[in-house]
């Protein structure tokens, strides 16, 4: 079998690995890069139409966001995931496509004035719908045979509703090898969802390392800390604006706010309004409510058994339309605004930042990881002004973080997860971490007695009876400058053309042995197309 590391190697976003085994080709995740591009993701070395399927570890866009593009370029296989992941992707991929279309439309309106070449979205709502139709959802802990010699199982990893590690059994030449892809390993004691499941055996492990160089410390008093932030901000007459990931983090915060209101922890503002200003978050909250309770932790199941909705509180309001969103900032009553995206790169949160960043009485509260190069990271690093919608905005609001609130395991959590394997895996491949973090965590595992390495994007490894051998090193050339938007779009469109060419070649090979009359007509059509475009 062969594995090609395509994305999220020595960086955190854009997860994608190609597994070629038992005569099949499967991608494990197909994610979009977000924030600063450190190492260029490598193109998939085969035409999308030649890929048999995709295994999705969870619904976050940095793990699934390029699935519509894969379909646009010719992929027609199945996408395998847990049932909650399939449900969440049905809303998240539509939302991502909407953002792609909106941004392309905005750039084209702006470009008309300067005579710029029109741009097209990376993918469309139609592409997202086509990808969603390919999903197949499964329960946890159920073995699924993808093909003879290829069996998988999803195991709860406690990162997000529906998140999973994926066990893969590959049988070739009468010998079975077990791979485990960790997915994003969850932090302990998160509200609503269960803690990560520890697996016992694997030959080769592919594990994330987001926080492989640090410890979260003792579990914070999330409810108490959040209540203090709300109290001092409301006492100043300001809003608490929370850039929040629509799926997972928003529901956790609603869980905390319900408890704050239930216990009366904010004095003098007991009925403060809480706005969910994200259509995606509203839909995600509905999916959380409709999910099988077996996916939730013991405390959440206990609340449900008492008839208590764990993510509902007095004063909760939702904003679906753009007009409803605009009205939030017209209301001067102190309030909580939960809006996406969590890293402030897109979505309605940018409008709320524009209206609240310059107000010293307000607080911008970050509650999740902020990738290098994102607006969120810029703000927590102390920027004094930022540009939003072409306008310079002075940063006068209080900027703070709810520390320790993370969906990712820290160094100790990662070590607990990997140390559960007995005996130790033959090799651990470290992925999904910032450049230096991957190096540090690889050394940590080496010191613990593991054989570990951190491949770069483009690396290829062959696994056989003799073990794992690197047959191609990945690229270590850093991206010094993000390519221009136009160049990036052009590269995407050209890649579609290349994929179409590869698909055409497959169709030609498939027609070998056909009737001469049909083959001649097919050849004439191809030649006519070539004559038209050979310029």
Where does each model-flagged region fall?
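Conserved acidic residues
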Residues: 52, 203, 335, 362, ...
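A polyampholytic, Gly/Pro-enriched intrinsically disordered region
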Residues: 100-105, 292-306, 469-495
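Short, surface-exposed amphipathic charged segments that create phosphate/polyanion-binding patches used
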Residues: 150-154, 287-295, 415-416, 465-475
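A general structural motif
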Residues: 185, 218-223, 314-324, 343-345, ...
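Short, compositionally biased "basic patch" segments
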Residues: 191-206, 293-300, 370-396
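Generic long, charged, amphipathic alpha-helical segments
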Residues: 387-418
């Amino acid at each position: 079998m062969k594995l090609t590391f395509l994305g999220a190697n020595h960086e955190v976003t854009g997860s994608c690995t190609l597994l070629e085994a038992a005569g099949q080709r499967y991608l494990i995740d197909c994610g979009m890069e977000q924030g600063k591009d450190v190492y260029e993701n490598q193109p998939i070395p085969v035409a999308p139409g030649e890929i048999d399927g995709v295994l999705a570890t969870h619904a976050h866009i940095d793990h699934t966001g390029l699935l519509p593009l894969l379909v646009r370029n010719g992929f027609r296989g199945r996408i395998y995931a847990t049932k909650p992941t399939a449900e969440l992707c049905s809303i998240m991929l539509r939302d991502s496509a909407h953002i792609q279309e909106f941004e392309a439309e905005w750039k084209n309106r702006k470009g008309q004035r300067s005579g710029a070449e029109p741009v097209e979205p990376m993918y469309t709502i139609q592409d997202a719908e086509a990808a969603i139709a390919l999903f197949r959802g499964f329960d946890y802990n159920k073995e699924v045979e993808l093909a003879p010699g290829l069996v998988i199982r999803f195991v709860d990893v406690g990162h997000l509703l529906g998140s999973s590690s994926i066990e893969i059994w590959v049988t070739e030449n009468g010998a079975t090898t077990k791979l485990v892809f960790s997915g994003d390993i969850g932090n302990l004691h998160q509200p609503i969802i269960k803690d990560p499941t520890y697996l016992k055996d694997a030959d080769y492990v592919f594990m994330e390392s987001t926080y492989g160089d640090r410890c979260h410390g003792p579990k914070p008093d999330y409810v108490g800390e959040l209540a203090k932030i709300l109290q001092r901000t409301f006492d100043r007459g300001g809003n608490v604006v929370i850039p929040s990931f629509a799926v997972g983090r928003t529901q956790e915060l609603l869980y905390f706010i319900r408890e704050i209101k239930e216990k009366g922890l904010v004095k003098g503002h007991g009925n403060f309004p809480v706005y969910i200003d994200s259509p995606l978050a509203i839909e995600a909250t509905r999916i959380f409510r409709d999910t099988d309770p077996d996916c939730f932790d013991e405390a959440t199941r206990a609340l449900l058994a008492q008839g208590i909705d764990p993510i509902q509180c007095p004063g909760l309001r939702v904003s679906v339309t753009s007009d409803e969103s605009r009205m939030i900032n017209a209301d001067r009553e102190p309030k909580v605004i939960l809006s996406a995206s969590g890293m402030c790169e897109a979505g309605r949160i940018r409008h709320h930042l524009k209206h609240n960043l310059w107000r010293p009485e307000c607080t911008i509260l970050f509650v999740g990881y902020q990738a290098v190069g994102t607006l969120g990271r810029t703000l927590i690093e102390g920027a004094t002004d930022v540009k939003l919608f072409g306008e310079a905005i002075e940063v006068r609001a209080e900027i703070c973080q709810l520390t320790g609130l993370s969906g990712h395991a820290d160094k100790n959590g990662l070590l607990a997860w990997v140390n559960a394997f007995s005996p130790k895996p033959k090799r651990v491949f470290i992925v999904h971490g910032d450049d230096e973090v991957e190096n540090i965590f690889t050394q940590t595992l080496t010191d613990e007695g593991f054989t570990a390495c951190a491949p770069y994007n483009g690396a290829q490894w062959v696994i056989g009876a003799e073990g794992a051998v690197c047959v191609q090193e990945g690229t270590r050339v850093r991206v010094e400058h993000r390519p221009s938007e136009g160049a990036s779009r052009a590269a995407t469109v050209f890649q579609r053309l290349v994929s179409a060419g590869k698909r055409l070649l497959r169709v030609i090979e498939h027609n070998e042995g056909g009737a001469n009359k049909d083959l001649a007509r097919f050849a004439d059509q191809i030649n006519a197309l070539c004559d038209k475009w050979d310029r």
